[in-house]
């Protein structure tokens, strides 16, 4: 096993002051960040086919597009609370919205339509994050206010062409980021309040709930938030309230610790289409950080082979 490399990320861009929210704290802020005023809370970065980076502002219902030069455009605003984005083949985005459930955002028409708001006549408790599998299935999390004292968060899968999602897990202490291995066999799940990343089979033979293993145990901070897997199977983990993101190989060995030199609220990660550069969302300063991990990943691949 190679030694874990410590890397300092660089600021790519920061939300401009002209886009700061300046009103009174809304309910989301009062509950999740008591006593604070937030100008934004960035989550869910996702690259489009042209290399633009999209991200969401959870409490204020905003979706931003960031171009190559780091310029921000407000692409959409609503009364929702978008937490995560997954790009769809037609250029639209599936959105995990804490308030409105699973929706579809069309960036060309600037429209949002509902995909589903709940399951079995029960509304979702509050969606957290989402990813799209190669076969078209949508995997998304429903943490609500779950934690170690109430491990009732859920993981869902909406199969391609289906209208109702399946409950895959219902016992997670705040399920958050979710990602799949390149071959679609494994699902990685951030159990934020357990400070751990779990792993399960996407198509397990179990008749009800699949067997789940603790894949990586973190320490410190709040816990893992967003997850992202590149084409070579390297798993990036945003370590919430720790000011860093981790990169693990497919065996779960740490390859790199990428530190953000600004705030500590590292919320989300996204691999650039080149598979070497990692974008990290940091909500305290409203910044997107970038780290080029090409040489580190190449060394790790060479060691594995």
Regions found by a protein language model. Name each.
Residues 1-26, 149-152:
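Blade/loop signatures of beta-propeller domains
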Residues 13-62:
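Beta-strand-rich domains and repeat architectures in extracellular enzymes and scaffolds
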Residues 26-35, 70-76, 113-121, 164-170, ...:
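A short beta-strand motif characteristic of beta-propeller blades
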Residues 32-50, 78-101, 120-138, 145-146, ...:
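Beta-rich, blade/repeat-based domains predominating
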Residues 58-59, 98, 146-153, 192-195, ...:
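Short, solvent-exposed loop/turn segments at conserved positions within beta-propeller repeat blades
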Residues 62-64, 101-103, 154-156, 196-198, ...:
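A short loop-to-beta-strand structural motif that recurs across blades of beta-propeller domains
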Residues 195-196, 216-250:
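Loop/turn-rich, solvent-exposed surfaces of beta-rich toroidal or solenoidal domains
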Residues 200-207, 292-300:
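Short loop/turn segments immediately following beta-strands, especially the blade-tip
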């Amino acid at each position: 096993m190679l030694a874990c490399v410590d890397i300092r990320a660089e600021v790519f861009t920061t939300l401009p002051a002209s886009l700061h929210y300046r009103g009174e704290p809304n309910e989301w802020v009062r509950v999740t960040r008591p006593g604070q005023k937030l100008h934004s809370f960035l989550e869910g970065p996702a690259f489009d086919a042209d290399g633009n980076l999209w991200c969401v502002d959870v409490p204020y219902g905003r979706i931003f597009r960031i171009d190559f030069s780091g310029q921000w455009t407000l692409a959409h605003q609503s009364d929702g609370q978008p937490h995560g984005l997954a790009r769809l083949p037609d250029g639209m985005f599936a959105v995990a919205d804490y308030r409105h459930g699973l929706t579809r955002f069309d960036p060309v028409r600037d429209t949002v339509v509902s995909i589903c708001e709940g399951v079995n006549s029960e509304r979702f408790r509050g969606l957290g994050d989402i990813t799209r599998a190669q076969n078209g299935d949508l995997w998304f999390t429903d943490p609500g206010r779950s934690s170690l004292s109430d491990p009732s968060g859920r993981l869902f899968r909406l199969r391609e062409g289906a209208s109702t999602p399946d409950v895959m897990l219902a016992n997670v202490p705040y399920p958050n980021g979710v990602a799949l291995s390149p071959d679609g066999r494994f699902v990685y799940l951030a159990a934020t309040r357990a400070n751990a990343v779990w792993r399960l089979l996407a198509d397990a033979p179990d008749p009800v709930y699949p067997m789940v293993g603790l894949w990586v145990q973190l320490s410190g901070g709040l816990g893992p938030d967003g997850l992202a897997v590149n084409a070579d199977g390297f798993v990036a983990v945003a370590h919430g309230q720790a000011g860093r993101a981790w990169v693990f190989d497919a065996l779960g060995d740490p390859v790199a610790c990428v530190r953000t030199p600004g705030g500590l609220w590292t919320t989300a990660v996204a691999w650039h289409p080149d598979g070497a550069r990692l974008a990290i969302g940091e909500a305290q300063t409203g910044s997107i950080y970038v780290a080029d991990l090409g040489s580190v990943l190449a060394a790790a691949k060479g060691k594995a082979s």
